[in-house]
A protein has these predicted regions:
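N-terminal beta-loop-helix "entrance" segment that forms/cooperates
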Residues: 42-54
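Short, hinge-like loop/turn segments at secondary-structure boundaries
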Residues: 51-55, 134-137
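Extreme N-terminal starter segment of soluble prokaryotic enzymes
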Residues: 1-5
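A charged, amphipathic interaction segment
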Residues: 82-146
Length: 158
């Protein structure tokens, strides 16, 4: 079985779409796929609703959480976002052309057994707690990603 890894660094809608389309395509072809979400890419995995965390966050971490998009449905475009208008137009065109949303692509990834891993160091820096992320996400550090990457024949950074 061929193995693919994707580092999802970006929290932009267009890049999240690319990452999940590639991951789902590889899984559909029978490949084992691991997606490692780090820094802004973690926003894709955030639950859309505000979550009360067990432990208290520091001021800067609370600020990060408040300023960043909460979940795949709130992501902006990397170019021509225009305060969210670009992303809204993109979602409309995608719907008209029957292109799956990021949320639908995440559901497909789960169904296909794609491993989604949140970077614990990035979570610490940004102040994200495990309960703030969607179900089915694993948690690991860079050593875990590197172990997976060593065994993969394709490693992408998006």
């Amino acid at each position: 079985v061929a193995k693919k890894t994707i580092i999802v660094f970006s929290g932009d809608l267009d890049k999240a779409l690319a990452a999940f389309i590639i991951a789902n395509g590889a899984a559909a072809m029978g490949d084992e796929v691991t997606m490692f979400f780090t820094f802004w890419g973690l926003n894709i995995l955030r639950k859309p609703e505000k979550v009360r965390t067990q432990s208290k966050k520091g001021f800067l971490q609370a600020m990060f959480g408040g300023m960043m998009p909460r979940g795949a449905g709130k992501l902006g475009l990397s170019k021509m976002n225009f305060g969210g208008m670009g992303a809204a137009m993109m979602r409309k065109v995608m719907k008209q052309h029957n292109v799956s949303s990021v949320e639908e692509l995440i559901a497909t990834a789960r169904e296909q057994g794609i491993k989604m891993v949140a970077c614990t160091m990035s979570m610490d820096v940004l102040g994200f707690k495990p309960e703030e992320l969607i179900d089915g996400v694993e948690f690991a550090g860079v050593a875990s990603y590197l172990g997976e990457a060593d065994e993969a024949n394709v490693n992408l950074f998006i």
